[in-house]
Amino acid sequence: MRTQGIKPRIREILSKELPEELVKLLPKRWVRIGDVLLLPLRPELEPYKHRIAEVYAEVLGVKTVLRKGHIHGETRKPDYELLYGSDTVTVHVENGIKYKLDVAKIMFSPANVKERVRMAKVAKPDELVVDMFAGIGHLSLPIAVYGKAKVIAIEKDPYTFKFLVENIHLNKVEDRMSAYNMDNRDFPGENIADRILMGYVVRTHEFIPKALSIAKDGAIIHYHNTVPEKLMPREPFETFKRITKEYGYDVEKLNELKIKRYAPGVWHVVLDLRVFKS
């Protein structure tokens, strides 16, 4: 979320059209993904929402404005209201990587940028990396582009998968990154991965057994989950450790990072874990 004072031009235009008390409620924060703007609006601004969106679009130079909503469902679909424009497909460039997506239907969090940048540095060219929840290539494209590693990207949702394939071509990594449109639990590979990405935060623990079956002995798993602050730092490591033990594995925690606040009192975290067969 970008925070700053309202652009003087926005205030200048809308102060002539909105009551003074509503001008004070104009959003000072927004998210820009490519040339699409995600704009939070207070309920009091509802009667003017389309005009407000139009002015923000003109001043900030975007083609489409969506009202921020909630993320829901197994595949983390956003629920946004279209306020201005019509085309919600865009190309967002970050750290030299092109991410094409439909912002209205596919989640992309600029707040996770540090983790995407970090992924560009973790893998070696001789590694095989399996991304179990690839999305549009959020985490695995940096590995393929900068780490030069071989990547298998698995994405269940057909619409999101279409953009994943496009992004592989856009970033010219077809020679080392392949994509599979399936539930990762149906992926046939076993004991193949040097590194596994589990960039998912809805019941991620349910996918640990599949990750273990894909992993080589000594593989590194980047395990994402959400955890109440009061349970940190014991969780989510203890749950991961318990499940790996049930399947005959030991685990070593190499690193733990906070990604962002997910909800009041809840953090999105990532653990870097090395797993060994007992």
Swiss-Prot record:
Keyword annotations: Cytoplasm, S-adenosyl-L-methionine, Transferase, tRNA processing
Record has Cytoplasm as a keyword: yes
Gene3D superfamilies assigned: Met-10+ protein-like domains (3.30.300.110), Vaccinia Virus protein VP39 (3.40.50.150)
UniProt cross-references to CDD domains, sorted A to Z: AdoMet_MTases
InterPro entries (UniProt xref): MeTrfase_TRM5/TYW2 (IPR030382), SAM-dependent_MTases_sf (IPR029063), TRM5-TYW2-like_MTfase (IPR056743), TRM5/TYW2-like_N (IPR056744), TYW2_archaea (IPR030867)
Subcellular location: Cytoplasm
Outcome after substituting E155A: Loss of activity
Entry EC no(s): 2.5.1.114
GO MF terms, alphabetically ordered: transferase activity, transferring alkyl or aryl (other than methyl) groups; tRNA 4-demethylwyosine alpha-amino-alpha-carboxypropyltransferase activity; tRNA methyltransferase activity
Effect of H138A: Decrease in activity
Enzyme class: transferase
Catalytic activity, reaction form: 4-demethylwyosine(37) in tRNA(Phe) + S-adenosyl-L-methionine = 4-demethyl-7-[(3S)-3-amino-3-carboxypropyl]wyosine(37) in tRNA(Phe) + S-methyl-5'-thioadenosine + H(+)
UniProt superkingdom: Archaea
Family statement drawn from the similarity comment of this UniProt entry: Belongs to the class I-like SAM-binding methyltransferase superfamily. TRM5/TYW2 family.
Biological role stated in the UniProt entry: S-adenosyl-L-methionine-dependent transferase that acts as a component of the wyosine derivatives biosynthesis pathway. Catalyzes the transfer of the alpha-amino-alpha-carboxypropyl (acp) group from S-adenosyl-L-methionine to 4-demethylwyosine (imG-14), forming 7-aminocarboxypropyl-demethylwyosine (wybutosine-86) at position 37 of tRNA(Phe).
Protein name: tRNA(Phe) (4-demethylwyosine(37)-C(7)) aminocarboxypropyltransferase
